[in-house]
Amino acid sequence: MSGESGQPEAGPSHAGLDWPNPERNRAGVPGGVIRRAGSQGPRSWIQKVLEQIMDSPRQCVTPSEVVPVTVLAVQRYLLEDEPRDTVPKPPLYCYDVTISDGVYQEKCYLDPSLNSLVYQNILKVGIQMRISRVSCLYNEKRIGQGILCIDNVHCGETSDSISLETPFRNRAHQEKPERPLRGGKSHYLALWNNEDPYGDIWLTDKQPEEHNFSDTKIISLSHLEMTWTNRRNFPALLVRILHKSKLRYYGKPDKKMIEPYQTFLEVADSSGTVSVIMWNALCPEWYKSLRVGLVLLLQDYSVKKSYPFRIQPVPVDPQIKLISTMEICLNLRDPPTNIIIIPEKQVKPEWRLPKLNHRFTTRSELDDMPENCICDVIGLLVFVGRVQRSKKKENREDFWSYRWIHIADGTSEQPFIVELFSTSQPEIFENIYPMAYFVCTQLKVVRNDNQVPKLLYLTTTNESGVFITGHRGQPYTYDAKVKNFIQWIRTKSDSGEQKNMVIGGYYPYPPVPETFSKYSSSIKVESLLTAISEVRKEIEDLQYREQKRIAIQGIITAIKYIPHSSATESASASETLRNANRPSTSQAARVEIQERNGKRHQDDEPVNSQYFQTTSTNLSLSNKIRILQGPHANPVAVPQPGASVQTKGIKPGMPSIFNRRANINANLQGKARKTISDRWESQLWREKKFGLIDHLHYSRVYPESIPRKFMFEHRKFLSDQYNSQPAKYVPPEGRPPKLDDFKSARSLGHFEVTILGLNHEIAIDVAFLPMYCPEDIRTSQIDTLLTSMNYSCAYPQDTTGNDRLPGPRAVAGDIIKAATELDRVHIVGILDICNLGNNKVEVYLHKIYSPENTS
């Protein structure tokens, strides 16, 4: 897709031009006065634009030639207020965009009027774009650095061939550490959140060093608590790290802090535990080198009264005194703190430093754990959702990054469901995939037993940490529950487990309650209901991977079933490579389903009542379709593409509506098939659809919305698809497959649902993506559309024996029949909306409340 934008006629500032000299030796130079280039060597478009700006007195020009350039980096930073700003502005994040014309690279400043292209992930790395207006501005805090400003741009498609070998025209742009083009900040931020350390200012090479304690005076924490108010100089502290928080970025435009970071450490000695706050420039120097369990010697610190509203984490040992009256502060200066990591081999027993006590919980124990209880878990990742974002505060530019994961530990049929927020460990958060052994600490239990389905999941806290590699040698490996998990893993085979692994896609968790009144009391928003006339703005205001849940009122007037297309049911990438000369299993399954379902070619007319009666009759109560309802339901049973899917009660060879249709259409064999579809539309819709003032079309299902069967050999590609867009271009490994090459973990296809506003003036088309499984006696009866449109979990299991599921067409018939029963009924629809980037938005119907369950 492409995006086009451009607001200002001139750049943000105008100043005399004094560009660094871009010599034509493909090496770049550090500075000087620009010179006209000779005719030798390849001609650089960037060079020509700079020469054109030099000749323009307004310093804002339209290039004489507009050619595509490649985007190699999009980097974000906070720009402080200008001196003329008397009223502090909200955070204004700026973007530097590195482009290449094939001859040179150039780091450019993106005019803030174009920031929305980054917010929507339209301007991103790897694409070609055409810059149609540029200007010049200077960083007045640095000598002789003229900056090329992008004022108008047209974003194109992803480039097929990208080279990273072209040099920077200006050598200053490749100096380390990287610095933003404007302002006084020394570093870039992560592109999509403020919690992750990003860039080369974050050091990782701090090593333990032996220390001679003969001349070191050490004070205990309890003694320091009693005497700190009467001291000017504090003796050293010898402590062990028990908890480490994620980073907090507190930068604001009106604050002049160079590196405004903060992190908390909970440390302890034999006398107590206390909070340690690491400030500012110490965070980039030390944060990534410090880990839970290390022993530290702290010298030249400061002490202050503790912040009264901060809640300290639960102590790892309840016998240790919790010191909450003071805090230890570590700074680069005033005074300059000295931190030493003590090697574990030098730690003496007489120091009596506390050991780490993990609180590992098994999945079978989770059902009985109270809300807000803190625990650690270990298990096998069986589902890894896409990275999503939620806004921290309305009308702000700050977001949380999170993803949903499922962890199995062998103690229950149910997995742990974990809401995993970024823990300032991007090297792990962005590289998790199914089949990995996963440890997460300091998780909090979230539960609600008073709603249907019951709510039970875990969420990360400020002190949570994740581990995915390097488990050997970690203190938790000696825990009995960890050893039991390792024993369980040894009984599993990789090939047997892989077929049940799922990655990515739309994941509508947590489920909403069974009544609208409970839903109303469970959410915290200013306006409970969104007018259907406001839905378009709600959707357009979403930023990249931002997911929201809104409620609208309306009337369901039409529904249409869309089976899996050939694209979404194609063979997996590895099967395509291995079985190029023979039909794939999924292809065989498609043929079987098409034959069973009668190759319907003439489905534009509404489904008639005979179809509903036949479908309803053939679905016995004991094998009714059930939509999975939250964590207390059985794992989803997804029929394998090659397996026989048969409606109970229909014997092979028995005439059915499907077989009758197949016979009717047999003479059409060899002709192009239309997409099979079943639909219904109400008389009200026929009367109103041509007189609407607006009809919103948001029912398209994109490949990114489909959860996929995980293939270990393509883990890097699949992980990249469901991670956030990177800030810097990374070349793919070999020839990457396409997302549609991987099998869908859903077996039913989807529905297009039309909801007409209560005033009959505006309608919206949305998608509904159910997944079904055999009846679960632990969940309530699900016989109507009202209860089936709820949370569907991507956790597939094989069907065995007599547990075969009815075919997708039978399920679709049941759902469409339920829709007809809502004709002219006022409902409340819960919509999940998410911006997928690049002008793609998903709008999915999560649940509908009828008048019976709105009270």
From Swiss-Prot:
Its main location: nucleus. The keyword Membrane does not apply. Coiled coil: none annotated. Gene3D superfamilies: Nucleic acid-binding proteins. Signal peptide: none annotated. Keywords: Chromosome, DNA-binding. Residues 1-34, 570-608 are annotated as: Disordered. GO terms for cellular component: nuclear speck; replication fork. Changing residue 240 to E: Decreased binding to single-stranded DNA. Residues 577-588 have a biased composition (Polar residues). One of its GO terms (molecular function) is RNA binding. Residues 592-604 have a biased composition (Basic and acidic residues). It is found in: Chromosome. GO terms for biological process: negative regulation of double-strand break repair via homologous recombination; regulation of DNA repair. This is RPA-related protein RADX. It comes from Homo sapiens.
